[in-house]
């Protein structure tokens, strides 16, 4: 996504006697990494294409709002991408593999699939958002996380649970502690919202998820 990176790859590839096969990242609206869709970027990519032992195999962008019902921004990103491809080909730079579709656009925008797609969250059986179609793919969660209860205690009504006491018991309650937290990648956003399955019965997550337990 920058000339300096390609130049470094070229030097390494030459030293190893191999070709570095790369894909160019184009930033059409995500505003993270990638070349901006400008004529100046075309100049840089033309220079990259001439570097020794560099083979440009693909060029891609990433949609910022494809999981929203309103696809206006996504269509605009696609327009910028297509325009940039036209500019490259006017310079006789033909890149064989073109890809733009993430999970949401795989579902809702089948005309954007081009040469390949990049399935992300749908690979795990989850929909990107509540706003995408549920009719195209019948998704089911493909992963589960198993652990053990490490401690059980009873607390009286009116007791606050975990950090900041965001959950307060309204009756005498049995509390189980599970040794998983946000340090393990378990989303803290599930605090007082998520559920766990214990011997076939759902139990609510109460209180704030900690670094290593909830």
Task: Give the location of each predicted region.
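Active-site loop/helix belt of alpha/beta enzymes
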Residues: 6-7, 11-21, 28-148, 155-156
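Sterically constrained small-residue positions within well-ordered secondary structures
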Residues: 15, 140-143, 168-169, 187, ...
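Conserved beta-strand segments that form the floor/walls of ligand-binding pockets within enzyme
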Residues: 23-25, 58, 99, 177-179, ...
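Generic beta-strand/beta-sheet core signal
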Residues: 101, 150-152, 199, 206
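Functionally critical, mid-to-C-terminal surface segments that flank or help form catalytic/ligand
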Residues: 145-192
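Compact, glycine-rich, soluble single-domain proteins
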Residues: 173, 183-185, 189-214
């Amino acid at each position: 996504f920058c000339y300096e990176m390609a130049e470094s790859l070229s030097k390494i590839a030459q030293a190893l006697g191999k070709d570095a096969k790369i894909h160019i990242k184009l930033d059409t609206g995500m505003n993270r990494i990638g070349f901006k869709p400008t004529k100046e970027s075309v100049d840089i990519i033309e220079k990259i294409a001439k570097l020794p032992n560099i083979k440009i195999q693909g060029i891609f962008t990433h949609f910022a709002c494809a999981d929203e019902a309103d696809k206006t921004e996504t269509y605009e990103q696609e327009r910028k991408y297509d325009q940039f491809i036209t500019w490259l080909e006017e310079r006789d730079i033909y890149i064989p593999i073109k890809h733009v579709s993430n999970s949401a656009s795989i579902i809702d925008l089948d005309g954007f699939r081009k040469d390949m797609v990049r399935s992300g969250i749908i690979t795990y059986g989850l929909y990107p958002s509540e706003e995408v179609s549920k009719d195209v793919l019948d998704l089911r969660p493909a992963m589960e996380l198993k652990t053990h209860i490490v401690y059980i205690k009873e607390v009286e009504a009116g007791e606050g649970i975990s950090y900041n006491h965001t959950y307060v018991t309204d009756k005498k309650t049995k509390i189980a502690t599970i040794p998983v937290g946000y340090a393990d990648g378990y989303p803290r956003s599930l605090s007082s919202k998520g559920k766990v399955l214990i011997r076939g019965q759902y139990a609510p997550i109460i209180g704030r998820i900690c670094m290593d337990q909830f």
